[in-house]
């Protein structure tokens, strides 16, 4: 029975239990894999073998011995522990980990390791006794008898004499058969052991299946003996071969470490053909011991040259495994070898990854030939396969290379392999050449190994430079990996260029450490792109990997960047492709990643290492798919950017294919370039595409594919999008333009550690979030713990951690005690009741109080006398009794003492104080003076004035390591609200009204009722404007409901007043009154009862069940009327009815007097019962007044009717010409029909129409009129005033008119608009500007014209260019951020009424240079002569209070303070920390050591250190000290300091000066420009360097920066202005055909078809040029391609464009809107021109500089004006020199001979051109919605425009690509057209 599992498990609506269980088992299988613990331990013990034995014995272990070559690592065995257990061991022996000498211990876990051969189940082993040499095909690829086209050239190496002699190779496997005839001759016992059996014999364990044949097979490939007529030949048949048996048992970390480190000084090469399971779901690698063994091996193996480890890459191809999940092949220390089949095709078992270094042969399909080698039981096999066969083959080739050069290091070997391996005929679809020129593949690494090339390279090899390791840690920011999407992270690496010991310039290995959490690891794919563009696949999707463990610091490695440069942008991409087995869409997270770059700082290859690669294989040419790109008509050289395919011309736009990348121009021409420019990314197939508008760099064109952002945007790295506001939990990092993550405990922040709001359970302490403990508790780093019972408050555990003591305890020397100790007394004098024990006077043994007069007992030898301790009568003061009873003199510093040393004082002279038995000048900083004695401060204080915790004067970290800060005499752990922790450990106040800050100038959070005001970040009172209310919770002004001028926080919708244009109703404001209300004087009033809509006069309609009657609502309409249910009105009954149910004559319910009711009809009682002729007409309803007048007229007519009742027909009324019953239908001449009656004159609101003969209504807004558009008086209402203008009524007068008495009158010139009277202007004509209602030619002083209105400059501003942008401040004020301030902020200094930034090292400064600092930005730096230094220079010391370097005393050479000399100047010696001369000499003398007497100074010196004139300290009057010499006048470069009588060096920028600072220059050095008294290499913004005068001259005030004084010399513009680059001008609003780029602050050209636009794309048009009309933002041509419109209206003709234009808007060559291929459009005069580097352009006067731009044409001629300007200085200087040399006559002669300078303009063409005015299309619907789509922002997207010709044919602009190019996102066609049938 066949089970259709696929259908069964995927069929919708069905859930089979067996299917579900099977899927669950598959998903949980990796999770349920059990660890097996052994009874073996690995232990690291310091102290040697004996110490290890002692510890092992103590805890019941047996010390088996050292683990391999790992020093201090030992193998312990415990016989009483279960041999194999799923639980780790417990018991007393586990206490070994607590031994001090035990540094590390690990119980060994069994690892699963798989041999990397493949056993074909159907193949029967065939054994041969004959020699196999002829059948070893992989040795004979060069003899043309085998399909393998590429040879490993092993015979070539043999012919050069290399066979592996003296090289030792060890096979790490299941043992080797050392007795095999092909192995026994080369067997090396020193390279062999049995780790599984713990002996030295590697012989395999034999069984019936011959399972342990693997190691013997691998060994035969390497070193099978040649010419012994037994079986086969090894690649290195004279090499020594050993084996380590380690796979035939439990494989643990210790087993592996022993194996890979076995006898490393003897073994050269270790070969391993095993690894973790190749099941497609395992992620495993070497554990700590094995990793250590690898590192030790490469560092110390082979006597420091490094062991060589060769590893098989893996056989998990069928399981879709990826060898990057194998930590052995993924290591930089191993050489990972893959396999290729004889045909060069990929074997089915092969895994691919970026760590594979090279390839050797193995088998492919089952029918392919396999590898011949030795086998168990002294036999041979021709069935060896898999990567297991490839690794030993590589080990053999490496052995040949090591024989050729035994001094190759382990890295040399890898370099040699990289340089000599080659692609050959190996078939892979991902071969690529990296930036260093190496061809590499994920399947085969650098290709097939070449033995001959390797030995040739090794012979002349020079050891590569030392390996450098650079760890580049990226920002740790978690990114969400969403299903079916990618996460990209970019990191700009420097290669550790700032650290010479770690600098990596040229790469070898690149390791990426990644931590990822994910619900299904197998769905992930990871890529890394190097700065050179080489893309490595670090991980591919793995179908069988269901693990939810993700990756934890897993190291992926790539060798694909070998030889490339390290510095630049590295891009990591993580893709999540959910599999069908994944039933949930939980996103993963990229938690962190880092780069480890391995390589060298210098080029690794010396000239002797240069070796040309030679392809040694039979080459059969494969047809190049690009051969179609011939260049039949062109035979010249191609542009360097063209590929080898060729070109059809010399320029980069003539390439048939590009070498690197290409642009597409507007006209679809492709230009080849070397790299994509900023704002673009490298798309597939060498194409440069544009990033999304907000991206600075990107990896795709969508808005969520940004890598960095433009200014003003921040990169949200989770979404890879650029946002203007970062999401919650992150902050705006302005320096990096990214959204940085707040620290873990922050809810909101302004920096990683600068929290402004904390998560639940935490409180803000300063700028960090931490736990706040209650009184009586302290925080130990994890939680709150109770203080010691003696403490009321504390900062740590124990009685010595108290801050205050509990009741009944007092503080003594930092501890809380119940009573004072001996020699202490209880002090009650402290403020606030604080009690403490203070030390007694030193003369007392015990005391009752302070001082020497409160003693209660005395020391031995002293007598108590009235509270004082007196010396006995034997000795005097200043003496003590020695042991012999004699009086001896105290040490000189003591007044009284009890011993001879300076520590035995008991009282001191008046100039000193007593401190612990010493008499000192001052108490140390941690003590305070009281009663001439030093007492310790409270332990929280650094300095103090008393013993309490509130008597501190300075703070530091306390004894518990807690940082403390001074606040009101207390040292606190955290500063209170409104203060910040400053340097010096003090809490300093924040700016006024600030609650949280980090310096005294910038506030982060204001107090309640205040808000932060940028840009200074100060707090101002929260004063809400009209229409806002103060939100107390968020402390900001929130808007009231729409229309409110005032409201309250309790109910923002309850308005106190309304804005203009809004109506008030029940405390709410409405744009229009709500239902059932009407507006009167901007108030809504309720309609009458039951009225649904009304005005102040009447109701318009009523609620259901009521009827409108006479302007009010009634339920019963009354007699003569009936309720019309449909209209909701009371309608009159027929005139015959008294009551009725409808208006018809037959709907009466009762009749008028004299009439009778008959079937609903009222009839005369005398009439026959037939319908009357006139009774079938209802009376029309009109306004009540009109109805009333008509009824009166009808009453008279009724009487007439009664009189003529006998007549059958009645005549019309006399006023009617014709009638319809009693109503007129038309009127005679002179009468007009109105309400079915004829009137002689029309009523108000109507006018007599001669044409219709009736009274026509005036327009609704007109009270009286004389014609349809001839209003005479407009309707006037209080809330709706209308004005009469030219016979029509308007709400406001048109431009140029003002309202007077309800009529629009003309404004007087030059008013454009006015109000109130003709001269009260609101705006002005032409160039006039408005100021206070008057139009002037220019604005008054301190004003600026903004949109034609004079605006006052900002406060304190002298001159401005915008109402918010000041250019020059009034005296005593300084310009900062476009505003004027009384003083400059921190990090700025005032200069020429401007705030100029300090150097980055300075917090405060008086100039821009690094030596102009007044306060350092880095608090750890020391300030010396304006410089911020790490340490103070010799002769100075650091003053801790202000971090300044102060000069040592004059005699001091080195000092630590002003009073502590450490070394003295010549002639002085240190005595008691002071430099003193042996003898005091006179001021004009010095001490001569030779004669031991004072000698006179030189006559030029005032004070000196020796006899010569260059040994002066000071100088006589009117001379000045220059270094150590006295001079009469200071030389140039120095200024004279008359106060100190010294020559002080000028600043390095000054030539002459008046002081040492950069702001005190009088003249500048050559090449510098003077600005005020400052010399600059480059003038600051607002100035330019004038080379003739050497000064910085002012730019025109319209420029922010410039190259000259004119308004056309601007290079950048101030805020609110935009630079028009082509003119060099700054514009407030961009001119016609340009739009304002708000980010770049430039005016950019619209698309050629746009007249006005919002962007440069073709779809951003707002209006169009002639011959185009607007449709959804695109200007569509009205003629077919190549033609333009001629004529207006619907009947127009289409004429052909000029031959140079592809599209145009008019005739001639200067009306082009699109160009043909190879031409670029000059936007300024709409011409199509060639590139200047094109051959045919050399004949043309004008051409485009395509090097500058490929998007539009830039004429080289436009540079002329700039160059002309820069040459001005040279011309002026030359003229001055000629004046001096030749005189006036020569100048006249020169002028007469001079020729006019050519101006940088264009020559007017003779061909006439017609200009066509632009117009706005009327086709744009008012309700048109332009939908935004997230799309590719590419420069050629707008080219795909479809338009229709006059004949109905639809045309399209087409895009052309290379013929071999296919793109999923874009179709490319030939010309096509469609016709509508």
UniProtKB/Swiss-Prot annotation:
Alphabetical list of PANTHER family matching this protein: PROPROTEIN CONVERTASE SUBTILISIN/KEXIN-RELATED (PTHR42884), PROPROTEIN CONVERTASE SUBTILISIN_KEXIN TYPE 5 (PTHR42884:SF7)
Could you identify this protein by its name? Answer: Proprotein convertase subtilisin/kexin type 5
SMART domains (UniProt xref): EGF, FU
Q: Name the Gene Ontology molecular function terms of this record.
A: endopeptidase activity; peptidase activity; peptide binding; serine-type endopeptidase activity
Q: Which residues does the entry place in the Extracellular compartment?
A: 117-1768
**Is Transmembrane helix among the key words of this record?**
yes
Function of this protein?
Answer: Serine endoprotease that processes various proproteins by cleavage at paired basic amino acids, recognizing the RXXX[KR]R consensus motif. Likely functions in the constitutive and regulated secretory pathways. Plays an essential role in pregnancy establishment by proteolytic activation of a number of important factors such as BMP2, CALD1 and alpha-integrins. May be responsible for the maturation of gastrointestinal peptides. May be involved in the cellular proliferation of adrenal cortex via the activation of growth factors.
Organism for this UniProt entry: Mus musculus (Mouse)
Please give the residue ranges the record annotates as the region AC 2. 1856-1877
């Amino acid at each position: 029975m066949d089970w259709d599992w696929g259908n069964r498990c995927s069929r919708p609506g069905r859930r089979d239990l067996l299917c579900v269980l099977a899927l669950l088992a598959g998903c949980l299988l990796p999770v349920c894999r059990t660890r097996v613990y052994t009874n073996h331990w690995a232990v690291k013990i310091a102290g040697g073998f004996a110490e290890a034995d002692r510890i092992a014995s103590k805890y019941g272990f047996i010390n088996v011995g050292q683990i391999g070559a790992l020093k201090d690592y030992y193998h312990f065995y415990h016989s009483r522990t279960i041999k194999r257990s799923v639980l780790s061991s417990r018991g007393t022996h586990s206490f070994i980990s607590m031994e001090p000498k035990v540094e590390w211990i690990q119980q060994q876990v069994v690892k699963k390791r798989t041999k990397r051969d493949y056993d074909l189940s159907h193949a029967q082993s065939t054994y041969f006794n004959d020699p196999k040499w002829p059948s070893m095909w992989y040795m004979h690829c060069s003899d043309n008898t085998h399909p393998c086209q590429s040879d490993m050239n092993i015979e070539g190496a043999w012919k050069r004499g290399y066979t592996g002699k003296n090289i030792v190779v060890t096979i790490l496997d299941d043992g080797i058969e050392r007795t095999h005839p092909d192995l026994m001759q080369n067997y090396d016992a020193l390279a062999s052991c049995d780790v599984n059996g713990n002996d030295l014999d590697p012989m395999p364990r034999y069984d019936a299946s011959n399972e342990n044949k693997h190691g013997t097979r691998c060994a035969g490939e390497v070193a099978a003996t040649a010419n012994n007529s037994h079986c086969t030949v090894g690649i290195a048949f004279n090499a020594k071969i050993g084996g380590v048996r380690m796979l035939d048992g439990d494989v643990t970390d210790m087993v592996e470490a022993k194996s890979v480190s076995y006898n490393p000084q003897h073994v050269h090469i270790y070969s391993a053909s095993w690894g973790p399971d190749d099941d497609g779901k395992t992620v495993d690698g070497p554990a700590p011991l094995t990793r250590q063994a690898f590192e030790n091996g490469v560092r110390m193996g082979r006597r420091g040259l490094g062991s060589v480890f060769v590893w098989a890459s893996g056989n998990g191809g069928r399981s879709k495994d990826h060898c990057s999940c194998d930590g052995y092949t993924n290591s930089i220390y191993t050489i990972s070898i893959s396999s290729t089949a004889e045909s060069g095709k990929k074997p089915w078992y092969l895994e691919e990854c970026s760590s594979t270094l090279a390839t050797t042969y193995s088998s492919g399909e089952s029918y392919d030939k396999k590898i011949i080698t030795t086998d168990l039981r002294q036999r041979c096999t021709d069935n060896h396969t898999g990567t297991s066969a490839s690794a030993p083959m590589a080990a053999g080739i490496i052995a040949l290379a090591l024989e050729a050069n035994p001094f190759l290091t382990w890295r040399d070997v890898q370099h040699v392999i990289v340089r000599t391996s080659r692609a050959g005929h190996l078939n892979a679809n991902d071969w690529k050449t990296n930036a260093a020129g190496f061809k590499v593949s994920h399947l085969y690494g650098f290709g097939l190994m070449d033995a001959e090339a390797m030995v040739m390279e090794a012979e002349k090899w020079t050891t590569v430079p030392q390996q450098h390791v650079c760890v580049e840690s990226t920002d740790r920011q978690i990114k969400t990996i969403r299903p079916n999407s990618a996460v990209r992270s970019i990191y700009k690496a420097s290669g550790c260029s700032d650290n010479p010991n770690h600098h990596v310039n040229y790469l070898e290995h690149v390791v990426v450490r990644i931590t990822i959490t994910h619900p299904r690891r197998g769905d992930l794919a990871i890529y890394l792109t190097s700065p050179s563009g080489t893309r490595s696949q670090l991980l591919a999707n793995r179908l069988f990997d269901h693990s939810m463990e993700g990756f934890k610091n897993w190291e992926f490695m790539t060798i694909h960047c070998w030889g490339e440069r390290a510095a630049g942008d590295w891009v990591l991409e993580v893709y999540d492709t959910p599999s069908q087995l994944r039933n949930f869409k939980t996103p993963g997270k990229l938690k962190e990643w880092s780069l480890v770059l391995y390589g060298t700082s210098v080029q690794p290859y010396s000239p002797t290492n240069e070796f040309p690669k030679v392809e040694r294989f039979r080459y059969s040419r494969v047809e190049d798919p690009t051969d179609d790109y011939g260049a039949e008509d062109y035979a010249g050289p191609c542009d360097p950017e063209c590929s080898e395919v060729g070109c059809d011309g010399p320029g980069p736009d003539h390439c048939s294919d590009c070498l690197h990348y290409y642009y597409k121009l507007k006209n679809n021409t492709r230009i080849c370039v070397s790299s994509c420019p900023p704002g673009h990314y490298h798309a597939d197939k060498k194409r440069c595409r544009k990033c999304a508008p907000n991206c600075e760099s990107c990896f795709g064109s969508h808005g969520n594919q940004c890598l960095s952002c433009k200014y003003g945007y921040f990169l949200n790295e989770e979404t890879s999008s650029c946002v203007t506001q970062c999401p919650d939990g992150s902050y705006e990092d302005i320096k990096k333009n990214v959204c940085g993550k707040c620290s873990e405990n922050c809810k909101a922040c302004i920096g990683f550690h600068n929290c402004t709001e904390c998560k639940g359970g935490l409180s803000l302490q300063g700028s960090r979030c931490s736990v706040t403990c209650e009184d009586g508790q302290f925080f130990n780093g994890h939680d709150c713990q109770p203080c010691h019972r003696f403490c009321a408050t504390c900062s740590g555990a124990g009685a010595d951690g108290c801050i205050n003591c509990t009741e009944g305890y007092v503080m003594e020397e930092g501890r809380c005690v119940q009573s004072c100790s001996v020699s202490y007394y209880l002090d009650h004098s402290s403020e606030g009741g604080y009690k403490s024990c203070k030390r007694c006077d030193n003369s007392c043994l015990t005391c009752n109080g302070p001082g020497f007069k409160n003693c209660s007992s005395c020391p031995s030898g002293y007598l108590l006398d009235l509270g004082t301790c007196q010396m006995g009568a034997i000795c005097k003061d200043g003496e003590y009794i020695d042991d012999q009873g004699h009086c001896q003199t105290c040490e000189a510093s003591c007044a009284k003492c009890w011993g001879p040393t300076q520590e035995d004082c008991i009282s001191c002279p008046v100039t000193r104080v007593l401190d612990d038995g010493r008499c000192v000048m001052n108490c140390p900083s941690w003590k305070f003076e009281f009663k001439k004695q030093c007492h310790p401060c409270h332990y929280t204080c650094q300095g103090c004035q008393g013993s309490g915790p509130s008597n501190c004067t300075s703070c530091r970290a306390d004894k518990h390591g807690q940082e403390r800060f001074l606040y009101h005499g207390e040292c606190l752990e955290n500063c209170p609200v409104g203060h910040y922790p400053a340097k010096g450990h003090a809490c300093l106040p924040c700016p006024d009204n600030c609650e949280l800050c980090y310096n005294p100038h910038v506030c982060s959070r204001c107090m309640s009722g205040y808000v932060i005001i940028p840009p200074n970040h100060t707090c101002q009172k929260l004063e809400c404007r009209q229409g806002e209310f103060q939100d107390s919770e968020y402390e900001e002004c929130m808007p009231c409901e729409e229309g409110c001028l005032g409201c309250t926080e309790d109910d923002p919708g309850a308005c106190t007043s309304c804005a203009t244009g809004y109506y008030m109703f029940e405390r709410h404001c409405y744009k229009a009154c709500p239902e059932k209300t009407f507006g009167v004087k901007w108030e809504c009033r309720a309609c009458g009862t039951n009225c649904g809509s009304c005005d102040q006069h009447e109701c318009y309609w009523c609620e259901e069940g009521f009827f409108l009657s006479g302007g009010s609502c009634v339920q019963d309409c009354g007699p003569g009327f009936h309720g019309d249910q449909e209209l909701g009105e009371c309608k009159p009954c027929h005139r015959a009815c008294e009551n009725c149910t409808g208006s018809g004559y037959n709907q009466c319910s009762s009749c008028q007097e004299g009439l009778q009711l008959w079937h609903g009809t009222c009839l005369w009682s005398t009439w026959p019962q037939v319908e009357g002729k006139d009774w079938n007409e209802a009376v029309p309803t009109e306004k009540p007044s009109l109805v009333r007048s008509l009824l009166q007229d009808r009453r008279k007519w009724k009487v007439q009717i009664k009189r003529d009742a006998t007549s059958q027909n009645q005549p019309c009324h006399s006023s009617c010409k014709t009638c319809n019953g009693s109503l007129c239908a038309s009127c005679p001449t002179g009468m007009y029909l109105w309400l079915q009656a004829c009137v002689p004159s029309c009523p108000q609101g109507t006018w007599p129409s001669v044409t219709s003969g009736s009274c026509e209504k005036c327009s609704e807004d007109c009270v009286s009129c004389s014609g349809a558009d001839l209003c005479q008086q407009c309707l006037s209402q209080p809330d709706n005033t209308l004005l009469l203008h030219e016979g029509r009524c308007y709400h406001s007068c048109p431009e140029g008119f003002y309202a007077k008495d309800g009529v629009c009158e003309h404004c007087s010139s030059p008013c454009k608009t006015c109000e109130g009277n003709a001269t009260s202007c609101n705006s002005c004509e032409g160039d006039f500007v408005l100021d206070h209602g008057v139009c002037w030619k220019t604005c008054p002083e301190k004003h600026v014209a903004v949109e034609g209105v004079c605006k006052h400059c900002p406060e304190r501003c002298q001159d401005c260019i915008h109402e918010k942008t000041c250019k020059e401040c009034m005296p005593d004020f300084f310009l900062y951020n476009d505003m004027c301030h009384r003083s400059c902020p921190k990090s700025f200094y005032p200069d020429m009424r401007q705030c100029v930034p300090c150097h980055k090292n300075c917090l405060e400064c008086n100039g821009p240079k690094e030596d102009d600092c007044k306060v350092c930005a880095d608090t750890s730096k020391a300030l010396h002569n304006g410089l911020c230094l790490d340490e103070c220079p010799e002769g100075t010391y650091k003053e801790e209070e202000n971090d300044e370097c102060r000069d040592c005393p004059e005699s001091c050479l080195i000092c630590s303070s002003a009073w502590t000399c450490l070394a003295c100047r010549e002639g002085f010696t240190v005595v008691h920390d002071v430099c003193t001369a042996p003898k005091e000499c006179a001021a004009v003398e010095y001490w001569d050591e030779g004669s031991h007497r004072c000698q006179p100074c030189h006559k030029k010196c005032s004070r000196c250190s020796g006899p010569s004139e260059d040994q002066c300290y000071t100088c006589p009057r009117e001379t000045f000290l220059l270094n150590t010499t006295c001079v009469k006048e200071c030389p140039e470069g120095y200024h004279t300091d008359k106060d100190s009588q010294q020559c002080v060096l000028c600043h390095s920028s000054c030539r002459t000066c008046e002081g040492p600072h950069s702001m005190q220059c009088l003249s500048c050095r050559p090449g510098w420009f003077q600005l005020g008294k400052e010399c600059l290499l480059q003038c600051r913004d607002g100035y330019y360097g004038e080379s003739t005068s050497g000064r910085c001259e002012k730019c025109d005030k319209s420029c922010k920066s410039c190259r000259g004084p004119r308004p056309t010399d601007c290079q950048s513009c101030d805020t609110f202005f935009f630079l028009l680059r082509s003119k060099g001008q700054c514009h407030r609003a961009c001119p016609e055909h340009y739009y304002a780029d708000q980010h770049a602050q430039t005016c950019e050209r619209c698309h050629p078809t746009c007249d006005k636009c919002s962007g440069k794309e073709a779809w951003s048009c707002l209006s169009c040029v002639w011959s185009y009309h607007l449709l959804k933002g695109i200007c569509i041509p009205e003629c077919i391609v190549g033609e333009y419109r001629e004529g207006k209206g619907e009947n127009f003709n289409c004429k052909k464009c000029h031959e140079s234009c592809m599209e145009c808007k008019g005739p001639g060559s200067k009306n082009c809107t699109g160009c043909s291929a190879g031409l670029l459009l000059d936007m300024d005069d709409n011409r199509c021109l060639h590139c200047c580097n094109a051959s045919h352009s050399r004949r043309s006067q004008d051409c485009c500089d395509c090097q500058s731009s490929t998007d539009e044409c830039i004429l080289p001629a436009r540079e002329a004006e700039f160059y002309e300007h820069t040459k001005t200085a040279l011309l002026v200087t030359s003229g001055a020199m000629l004046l001096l040399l030749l005189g006036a006559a020569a100048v006249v002669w020169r002028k007469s001979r001079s020729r006019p300078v050519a101006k940088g303009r264009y020559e007017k063409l003779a061909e006439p051109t017609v200009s066509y005015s632009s117009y706005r299309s009327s086709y744009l619907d008012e309700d048109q919605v332009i939908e935004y789509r997230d799309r590719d922002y590419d420069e050629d997207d707008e080219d795909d425009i479809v338009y229709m010709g006059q004949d109905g044919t639809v045309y399209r602009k087409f895009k052309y690509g290379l013929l071999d190019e296919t793109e999923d996102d874009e179709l490319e066609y030939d010309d096509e057209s469609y016709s509508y049938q």
